[in-house]
Amino acid sequence: MVENSFCKKEGSPVVGDRINVKDLTLAGLERLLTGMGAERYRAGQVAIWVFQKGAESFREMTNLPANLREKLDAAAVISRPEILAKKVSSKKDAVKYLFGLPDGQAVESVFMKHAYGNSVCVSTQAGCRMGCRFCASALGGLTRNLSPGEIYDQVLGIRRDTGERISSVVLMGSGEPLDNYDATLTFIKNVTAPYGLHIGCRHITVSTCGLVPGIRRLAREKLALTLAVSLHAPNDRLRDILVPVNRKYPLTELMAACRDYAQETGRRVTFEYALLAGVNDRKEHAEELVRLLKGKMPCHVNLIPANPVPERGVKTPSRLQVELFKKILERHGLAVTVRRGLGADIDAACGQLRRKIAVMGERLNTRG
């Protein structure tokens, strides 16, 4: 394990009286360095060291003058990820990580191997306040937002641990990305930049449970990001229960925002639909889903056989039920996939490993 020096204040790029450079964009680095009397181009050099090469100290930045490195050491820090726990799937196609934060919180990330490359699923918040019924992340509520650097460190930490190239990122771990909008956008700008990992926007997926103002704000950025909407129900009555934010932003508003997003960005919208046994997986639900989506916008439906969450009473549907649901959608012309089951044996659903470790800690403390 390495020493951790993440941001200690929510929403602030300051560690004590020093700035965490991973919380800054290139423009922010330029302001920092020119304020030290350095030339503007030095910011690009620092950015490459930090966001692309994964440098953990300013001493590594050998193309910077020694006096500038000393000034950076005095005014700034480079946060470093600390792996608290790691679980590898039996098929070796997924690795679940639990990263520690300096305030004692922990966040989850998942490394996934696909035929087309390697992807990382990152968290944007410690916990979540959206309260989705089937999600383990929401069980403890929201603790705090992550800083841009804390999000970025999940990617760098996994890259360092696996030695693998990361070709795509999904913001689909613990938390609601659009509920932590500014940090999410800063992370995206850095990870897609030439000075960062240079991952194309089309290979970045932003997941949301349906925060309509956030979707509209993201559309105005005109970035070719993939928007993944956690739909999970074809009508307001059921969605009000499964995804409580629907009570504030019902399906009519959500669908309108999604149509506008597709129009503004030229990207089709992905609708995530977690199939919960006996809850939303029946024939009538599939037919309602067709009526909701067909012909409304360029879209794709991703069916997700739910991971069991005993605390929520969530059960996984049978393979036959999943296939029947899929065939109904396909018969009506919708583009459908069933998410490949990566990491079910490593608690890869949102919040499961974090909660399991926390419960273990509580038991140990009780015994002590």
UniProtKB/Swiss-Prot annotation:
Question: Which GO biological process annotations does it have?
Answer: rRNA base methylation; tRNA methylation
The record places domain Radical SAM core at 114-345
Residues where S-adenosyl-L-methionine binds: G175, E176, S207, S230, L231, H232, N307
- The residues responsible for catalysis, as annotated, are E108 (proton acceptor), C350 (s-methylcysteine intermediate)
Per UniProt, the cofactor note for this protein states: Binds 1 [4Fe-4S] cluster. The cluster is coordinated with 3 cysteines and an exchangeable S-adenosyl-L-methionine.
Which SUPFAM superfamilies does the record cross-reference, listed alphabetically?
Radical SAM enzymes
A GO CC term? cytoplasm
Which Pfam family name is an example for this entry? Answer: RlmN_N
Could you list this entry's UniProt keywords, alphabetically sorted: 4Fe-4S, Cytoplasm, Disulfide bond, Iron, Iron-sulfur, Metal-binding, Methyltransferase, rRNA processing, S-adenosyl-L-methionine, Transferase, tRNA processing
Known catalysed reaction(s)?
Answer: adenosine(2503) in 23S rRNA + 2 reduced [2Fe-2S]-[ferredoxin] + 2 S-adenosyl-L-methionine = 2-methyladenosine(2503) in 23S rRNA + 5'-deoxyadenosine + L-methionine + 2 oxidized [2Fe-2S]-[ferredoxin] + S-adenosyl-L-homocysteine; adenosine(37) in tRNA + 2 reduced [2Fe-2S]-[ferredoxin] + 2 S-adenosyl-L-methionine = 2-methyladenosine(37) in tRNA + 5'-deoxyadenosine + L-methionine + 2 oxidized [2Fe-2S]-[ferredoxin] + S-adenosyl-L-homocysteine
Claim: Transcription is one of the keywords in the record: no
Annotated PROSITE patterns:
RADICAL_SAM (PS51918)
Disulfide bridge positions per record: C121-C350
In alphabetical order, the GO MF annotations are: 4 iron, 4 sulfur cluster binding; metal ion binding; rRNA (adenine(2503)-C2-)-methyltransferase activity; rRNA binding; tRNA (adenine(37)-C2)-methyltransferase activity; tRNA binding
- Under which EC number(s) is this enzyme classified? 2.1.1.192
> Which cofactor names does the annotation list?
[4Fe-4S] cluster
Q: Where in or outside the cell?
A: Cytoplasm
Q: Which residues bind [4Fe-4S] cluster?
A: C128, C132, C135
Chief location of this protein within or outside the cell: cytoplasm
Give the family this protein belongs to, as stated in its UniProt record.
Belongs to the radical SAM superfamily. RlmN family.
Extra remark beyond the main annotation: Reaction proceeds by a ping-pong mechanism involving intermediate methylation of a conserved cysteine residue.
Role description: Specifically methylates position 2 of adenine 2503 in 23S rRNA and position 2 of adenine 37 in tRNAs.
Q: What is this protein called?
A: Probable dual-specificity RNA methyltransferase RlmN
Species per Swiss-Prot/TrEMBL record:
Pelotomaculum thermopropionicum (strain DSM 13744 / JCM 10971 / SI)
